A protein has these predicted regions:
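Conserved nucleotide-sugar donor-binding catalytic segment
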Residues: 1-73
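C-terminal, non-catalytic tails of nucleotide-sugar-dependent glycosyltransferases
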Residues: 3, 14, 71-97
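Active-site and donor-binding regions of nucleotide-sugar-utilizing enzymes
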Residues: 101-227
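Conserved catalytic-core segment of nucleotide-activated headgroup transferases in glycan assembly
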Residues: 111-115, 215-295, 401-407
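A donor-sugar binding/catalytic signature common to diverse glycosyltransferases
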Residues: 155-161, 311-354
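Catalytic binding pocket for nucleotide-activated donors in carbohydrate/polymer assembly enzymes
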Residues: 180, 202, 206-209, 330-399
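Nucleotide-activated donor-binding/catalytic signature segment of Leloir-type glycosyltransferases, i.e.
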Residues: 288-310
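C-terminal amphipathic helix plus adjacent low-complexity
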Residues: 372, 376-441
C-alpha cells in the first residue's frame, strides 16, 4: 500500500508514478536543489517511508560556487511552510536541557589521563564530574573513548579516540568496526584524522547525531602546563638522572623480550635510557608478568637505565625525553606534541593475535627500522635530526587547536545540553568528502 521507498540517505529517492502524479509540486523555483527539497518536504510530511542503510553509488563532492540563488529560494520555501509544521520541525532538533553531570568512562590509566583535561575544564564550569570503569553505567552526559561503548545508557554522549594510532590496521575506515552513529558528538584530534573521517563519512555509521568535530586532542592542551613541567623536574630529581640525551622506551605491549632488545642495543651509548611501561589492568596478567620480569633482570644493572612507574602519566616521561622508541604505540604520536621524534621497530611482534603479528605502523610521522638497526638509527637521529624534519612536519598535522581543545569541547556540551549560546566551535564541524548518490538522477 506504500507509494514510496526511500533508500540510503535523503539524497536517494525512488518514487512510483502514482506518487509523483498525486503530488502538487511543480518546478516553480530556478534552483533544481530547492525544487527537490520542496518535493522531499511533501514526501516526509504526508507519506509512508521505508529506510535502507545501503547506498547505491558514491561520488566525490566538489565545493559549491554560488549559493545565493538557493539561499534566496530556500527562504521563500520556508516562508510558505505552515507555521505549525515549522514549529514541529524545530522541536525535533531541539534537545532538552540536561543536568550538569558528566560521567567519564575509562578502562585504563591511559584513557583516564586522556579524559582528565576535559573533566578539569568541566569542573571549572560547575559540572559535577565522575569517572567510572563500568562502561554500562547510566549517565546524564557520557564521554567515551573505548573500542566498545554503550552510548544508549547516556542521555547525551560524546566519543573521542583513546589512542592516536587507534585502529591503524584498518585505516582509513576505523568506523566500520567502531561505529559512531549511536553518539551525539564525535571528536577527532587533528587534520590527518579529519581526512580519514571525511573519506568514510558517506557511511551512516560514521556520523554522530550532532556531527563530528576537529576539536583536537585533550592532552595537547597540557604540554605547556606548569604542573607537567614541575612533575617532570621532580621525577628527574628523584631518579638522579643527569642532563644528557634521553631515549624513552614505551611499547604498546611488553613481550618477546623487547625491553631486553632495547637495552642491549643502546646500553653502551653516552645517553640516558628511560623505560615507561603501560599500567595494564589485571585481566592482562601475562603482560604484567612480562613487565615485572624485564624490570627484575635489568634494574640496577646499568648506570644509565631509569624506570618511570607505569602509573605515572606518559606526559611526564615525554617531557623528560629527547626521542621515543616503541613498536606501534600511540606514544609516538603524543611525542610529536612536544616536537620529539619517534622510532618504530617494525619486527617487534604484537601478541593481540594468534600467532602474534609484526608491528603495524602505517603512520608517516614515525621513523621506522628493524631491531638490528636500532642503534644506528638512534645515533643518526641524535647527530642529524634535521634529516627528519619532513617526518616531524607530517606529525604536526596529527594535532589541531592546541590550547583550546577542552574549551571547544565544553562549549559544544554547553550548547547542546544547557542552551548555551557560544557557537564558535561550529567552525570545526566536518563535512563528508563523498556523498551517497543514485544512478537515476
Amino acid at each position: 500500500d506504500n507509494d514510496i521507498n526511500l533508500y540510503g540517505s535523503l539524497s536517494n529517492i525512488l518514487l512510483n508514478k502514482k506518487c509523483v502524479y498525486s503530488m502538487q509540486n511543480k518546478c516553480i523555483y530556478k534552483s533544481d536543489a530547492i525544487n527537490r527539497l520542496c518535493m522531499l518536504f511533501q514526501i516526509i510530511t504526508s507519506e509512508k517511508i521505508f529506510y535502507m542503510e545501503k547506498s547505491l553509488v558514491r561520488v566525490k563532492m566538489s565545493p559549491r560556487r554560488d549559493e545565493n540563488v538557493e539561499n534566496y529560494e530556500y527562504r521563500q520555501l520556508v516562508s510558505n511552510i505552515n507555521c505549525d509544521e515549522l514549529t514541529s520541525m524545530n522541536n525535533i532538533c531541539k534537545l532538552p536541557k540536561l543536568k550538569k553531570e558528566i560521567t567519564f568512562f575509562y578502562t585504563s590509566k591511559g584513557e583516564y589521563y586522556n579524559l582528565k583535561p576535559i573533566a578539569d575544564t568541566a569542573a571549572n564550569r560547575g559540572y559535577k564530574i565522575k569517572f567510572t570503569k563500568d562502561k554500562k553505567e547510566k549517565a546524564e552526559i557520557g564521554v567515551y573513548c573505548q573500542h566498545v561503548c554503550y552510548p544508549e545508557n547516556s542521555r547525551f554522549s560524546l566519543i573521542l579516540l583513546h589512542d592516536l594510532a587507534q585502529g591503524h590496521n584498518r585505516w582509513p575506515n576505523l568506523w566500520e568496526n567502531e561505529r559512531w552513529n549511536g553518539f551525539d558528538i564525535g571528536i577527532v584530534p587533528g587534520k590527518s584524522w579529519a581526512d580519514r573521517w571525511r573519506k568514510c563519512a558517506c557511511f551512516y555509521y560514521a556520523n554522530p547525531r550532532c556531527g563530528t568535530f576537529e576539536f583536537g586532542y585533550p592532552k595537547s592542551d597540557c604540554i605547556n602546563d606548569i604542573g607537567i613541567l614541575n612533575r617532570g623536574a621532580e621525577v628527574k630529581k628523584l631518579l638522579a638522572m643527569p642532563d644528557r640525551f634521553t631515549v624513552l622506551y614505551a611499547p604498546s605491549w611488553e613481550n618477546d623480550n623487547k625491553e631486553d632488545d632495547f637495552i642491549k642495543s643502546l646500553q653502551n651509548l653516552d645517553i640516558n635510557l628511560m623505560v615507561k611501561q603501560a599500567a595494564w589492568p589485571e585481566v592482562y596478567q601475562h603482560i604484567r608478568g612480562n613487565i615485572e620480569y624485564m624490570r627484575s633482570i635489568h634494574e640496577g644493572r646499568f648506570e644509565n637505565l631509569y624506570y618511570i612507574e607505569p602509573e605515572e602519566s606518559i606526559m611526564t616521561a615525554l617531557s623528560l625525553c629527547d626521542m621515543v622508541v616503541s613498536d606501534e604505540s600511540s606514544v609516538m604520536a603524543e611525542a610529536l606534541m612536544f616536537g620529539k621524534p619517534s622510532v618504530a621497530v617494525t619486527d617487534w611482534m604484537i601478541p593481540d593475535e594468534d600467532p602474534p603479528r609484526p608491528a603495524s605502523v602505517p603512520m608517516d610521522y614515525v621513523i621506522k627500522c628493524e631491531k638490528k638497526d636500532l642503534r644506528e638509527k638512534v645515533l643518526s637521529i641524535m647527530n642529524h635530526s634535521e634529516e627528519y624534519e619532513d617526518i616531524l612536519q607530517k606529525g604536526r598535522d596529527t594535532f589541531s587547536n592546541q590550547g583550546n581543545v577542552c574549551k571547544d569541547i565544553m562549549d559544544a556540551i554547553d550548547y547542546y545540553t544547557q542552551g548555551g549560546t557560544e557557537d564558535s566551535f561550529m567552525s570545526r564541524k566536518l563535512e563528508s568528502e563523498y556523498r551517497a548518490f543514485n544512478m537515476w538522477n
